[in-house]
Regions:
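A cross-family phosphate/adenosyl-ligand binding-site feature
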Residues: 1-32, 36-46, 53-111
Length: 111
């Protein structure tokens, strides 16, 4: 299934990208369908992180983000610098708005 999807993709948008998903992507682990699709994919990759601020600023997460950002045709968008998080805390780590997500996907698809 993941091979077929990867061959048809014009863009791969990871929304939301958790710390765990980003770690798997950065290190080439494929324990689930999403990360298997990522490894089989050759289309541009848009990564939209969303997690608790402490998780986002952790050195391991920042290192994984840097690894991914350095890869060809990869772009990390976000997270927001502040806002209400899913855990109920306020701070950095919030997913960017749907408008930003759509804009980034359309920009990637339109030369």
């Amino acid at each position: 299934m993941h091979i077929d999807l990867a061959q048809k993709a014009d863009v791969l948008a990871i929304v939301p990208a958790s710390a765990n998903t980003m770690a798997c992507m950065a290190q080439g682990f494929a324990p689930n369908a999403l990360t298997s699709l990522y490894l089989a994919n050759r289309a541009p990759v848009l990564i939209f992180p969303a997690m608790n601020g402490n998780m986002w600023t952790h050195p391991a997460t920042q290192q994984n983000a840097a690894i991914l950002a350095a890869r060809e045709h990869h772009r990390i968008v976000g997270p927001e610098d502040s806002g209400m998080l899913a855990c109920g805390a306020e701070g950095q780590g919030r997913l960017v708005s749907v408008d930003v997500i759509v804009e980034e996907i359309l920009h990637t698809l339109t030369p």
